[in-house]
Amino acid sequence: MAREQDFAPGVGDIEIYANTDRQGIWLAWQDNVPLGCIAAVNYNPSYAFIGLFVVKPKHRGQGIGRRLWQHALKNLSSVECIGLEAAVQMVGFYEKAGFQKYCVTTRRQMLCRSDQSQHPNTTLLQRSDITVVPLREISLEAIQRYDERHEISPRPHFLELWLRHRAGDVFVARDSQGACHGYVRIRPCLLPIGEGWRVGPWLAEDPVMG
């Protein structure tokens, strides 16, 4: 469903969400046919994130999306802070539910020719004493410490599953002491037609590092 609606889900994303929160994925079914879905994933007791909220076009306007939404919020009722990314046409809906705009997310896309490499460029760059290395050359704990300083809330369980998933690659800006100064994950994604790549999370201390 998400692929059909141009969400471009990453390969393995649902698996990671489900393993982060066993009660975090909800679907609406009728006669063994999925009509809609929503992800409402607890990262920890104080923070959760909602995404993959979609209902098939021919089933919209029947209250399915609202029931999925209410079910997700009920499941997250004890969480202190809930985040989400809103499609432009859904901003009003979320504001009525009590959500406030925090920042604007810009989606950027690059189309590749069919004769180009099917795998992203993994050339490692160097700057000063900092080297860009693959995940295996730095400790997971170093990345988690960096992530905690730059994200709204700690998410060690989710982050471990996210970084170690077999789909895609992770690259880290590491200094000579083994500390993390930024990281990025690139993974294959499912486009409405064919496949592509998604980049994220992408955290860095400055534009040059990024």
Model-derived features: where do they sit?
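N-terminal non-globular leader segments, chiefly Sec-dependent signal peptides
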Residues: 1, 7, 31, 43, ...
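Active-site rim helix/loop that mediates acceptor-substrate recognition in acyltransferases
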Residues: 1-39, 149-171
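Core nucleotidyl-transferase/polymerase catalytic module
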Residues: 26, 88-89
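Conserved beta-strand in the GNAT
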Residues: 27, 32-41, 48-54, 172, ...
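Short alpha-helical
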Residues: 45, 89-92, 138, 154
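Conserved GNAT acetyl-CoA-binding A-motif
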Residues: 50, 69, 75-87
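Conserved acetyl-CoA-binding loop-helix of GNAT-fold acetyltransferases
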Residues: 52-55, 61-74, 92-96, 206-210
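Amide-forming acyltransferase catalytic core, primarily the GNAT-like/NAT-type
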Residues: 99-201
